[in-house]
């Protein structure tokens, strides 16, 4: 049995206290605790505590320390329950203490996966124009439950998905001006798949793109690639030249009619 002889505020940290005890051989330093632990255990001068109680105090001190670490981690941005658990494990906090800390954080509403998922969907759809499947995968990696993700994605209606997908198309299609319409369409489709949009949404956007097809741009692209391949293959004669030109331009996404029209033009020029 020991008796608390003195409680002293630490000089550098006003919320921490040094506890001095007497085990029958005079006053000695016992341990230090956070203010929350001091209050929880009602520590005061003259209080008698045994080894079991001291062990309990020190355990709660570790819990409080981990709790404050988690609060600091959460102060920068919202986190999921799994992210906080992983952070504490990296800090070499024991699983029993992590469980207690998570329970307290949930109770105090410092972590809430439902609120996190809704905010994440809004941010990723409005700011980064990501598609639903990519957002779903990212939330799953963060440990959010499938049912919560499905509910949160209701914040991302199909109309908004189409708007975002078409916005991405408008930004990207400028870089494909020297490609055939078919090749540009394929590249844009691949980009939207990577961004997480459904086939249905992509099809709607590509149909709109088809209606906006600029024949003059298609012709420019045909002339650009056609003249490039013409210089490359003009050393060949007859069928070999024609076959190589057709294969090269067809791979670039031009139709047979477009290719034959170009070859006819070059023939008339030549």
Curated annotation (Swiss-Prot):
Q: Which Gene3D superfamilies match?
A: Winged helix-like DNA-binding domain superfamily/Winged helix DNA-binding domain
Where it mainly occurs, coarsely classed, is cytoplasm
Q: Which GO terms describe its biological process?
A: regulation of DNA repair
Question: In which compartments does the protein localize?
Answer: Cytoplasm
Keywords from UniProt, A to Z, are:
Cytoplasm
* Record keyword ATP-binding present: no
Q: Name one GO cellular component term.
A: cytoplasm
Q: Tell me which Pfam families the record gives.
A: RecX_HTH1, RecX_HTH2, RecX_HTH3
Q: Which domain of life is it from?
A: Bacteria
Which InterPro entries does the record cross-reference, listed alphabetically?
RecX_HTH_1st, RecX_HTH_2nd, RecX_HTH_3rd, Regulatory_RecX, WH-like_DNA-bd_sf
Instruction: Report the sequence similarity comment from the record.
Output: Belongs to the RecX family.
Q: What does this protein do?
A: Modulates RecA activity.
What protein name applies here? Answer: Regulatory protein RecX
Q: Which organism is it from?
A: Bacillus cytotoxicus (strain DSM 22905 / CIP 110041 / 391-98 / NVH 391-98)
Q: Which gene encodes it?
A: recX
């Amino acid at each position: 049995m020991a008796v608390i002889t003195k409680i002293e505020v630490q000089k550098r940290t006003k919320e921490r206290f040094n506890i001095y005890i007497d085990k029958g051989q005079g006053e000695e330093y016992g341990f230090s605790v956070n203010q929350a632990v001091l209050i929880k255990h009602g520590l005061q001068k003259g209080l008698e505590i045994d080894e079991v109680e001291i062990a309990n105090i020190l355990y709660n001190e570790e819990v409080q320390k981990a709790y404050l670490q988690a609060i600091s981690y959460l102060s920068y941005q919202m986190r999921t329950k799994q992210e906080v658990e992983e952070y504490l494990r990296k800090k070499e906090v024991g699983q029993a203490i992590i469980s207690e800390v998570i329970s307290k954080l949930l109770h105090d509403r410092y972590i809430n996966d439902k609120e996190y998922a809704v905010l994440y969907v809004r941010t990723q759809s409005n700011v980064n124009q990501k598609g639903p499947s990519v957002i779903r995968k990212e939330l799953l990696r963060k440990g959010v439950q499938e049912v919560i993700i499905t509910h949160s994605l209701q914040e991302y209606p199909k109309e908004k998905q189409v708007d975002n997908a078409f916005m991405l198309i408008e930004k990207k299609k400028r870089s494909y001006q020297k490609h055939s319409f078919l090749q540009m369409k394929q590249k844009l489709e691949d980009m939207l798949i990577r961004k997480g949009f459904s086939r249905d949404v992509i099809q709607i956007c590509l149909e709109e793109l088809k209606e906006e097809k600029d024949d003059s741009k298609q012709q420019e692209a045909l002339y650009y690639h056609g003249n490039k391949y013409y210089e490359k293959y003009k050393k060949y004669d007859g069928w070999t030249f024609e076959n190589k030109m057709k294969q090269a331009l067809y791979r670039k996404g031009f139709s047979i009619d477009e290719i034959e029209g170009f070859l006819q033009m070059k023939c008339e020029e030549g």
